[in-house]
Regions:
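Short alpha-helical Gxxx[C/S/T] motif in the catalytic ATP-binding
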Residues: 99, 103
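Short beta-strand/loop element within the Bergerat-fold HATPase_c
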Residues: 48-60
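Conserved glycine-rich
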Residues: 112-113
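Short helix-loop "hinge" at the ATP-lid/N-box region of the Bergerat-fold HATPase_c
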Residues: 41-42
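Short conserved segment of the HATPase_c
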Residues: 73-86
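Conserved catalytic submotifs in the C-terminal HATPase_c
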Residues: 7, 12-24
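Acidic ATP/Mg2+-coordinating residue in the GHKL
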Residues: 68
Length: 133
């Protein structure tokens, strides 16, 4: 449960009020995928950390970014993060490694992509793009 994790670790979530974005897709499955990415960021944030969300759109795609201020991904894990049942070197919790794979499948089924990378000043970032028809 995300709210339990937020309270337990005293994590803040920052989402700017940039207005609305629109895309063609399944809202419930998209929210499931976004929550999986947010959970990953929360689990890898230090107590008192911040998880950030940003979003924008252009004529080609809608873009959502979710990032944290944790240690980032182990570089050797990045190519495998979205593989089913893969648990990275810095894995926490008792997951079995399907959350990120599920998120990727959900976005790909909606003509989208999800990538993961380390931020220059520390932390990990997920970048989602859902393309227009």
């Amino acid at each position: 449960n995300l709210s339990d994790l937020l309270r337990k670790k005293h994590i803040s979530v920052e989402i700017p009020e940039n207005g609305c974005i629109e895309f063609s897709g399944d809202l419930e499955w998209t929210m499931e995928a976004l929550m999986n990415l947010m959970k990953n960021c929360m689990e890898h944030s230090q107590s008192g950390g911040i998880v950030h969300c940003g979003y924008s759109e252009n004529p080609l795609y809608v873009e959502v970014r979710i990032w944290d201020d944790g240690a980032g991904f182990d570089p050797e894990d990045i190519p495998h993060l979205f593989d089913r049942f893969y648990r990275g070197r810095r894995a926490v919790g008792n997951g079995i490694g399907i959350g990120l794979a599920l998120a990727r499948s959900i976005f790909e089924l909606q003509n989208g992509t999800v990538t993961a990378y380390n931020l220059r000043n520390g932390g990990a970032c997920f970048e989602i793009r859902i393309y227009s028809h």
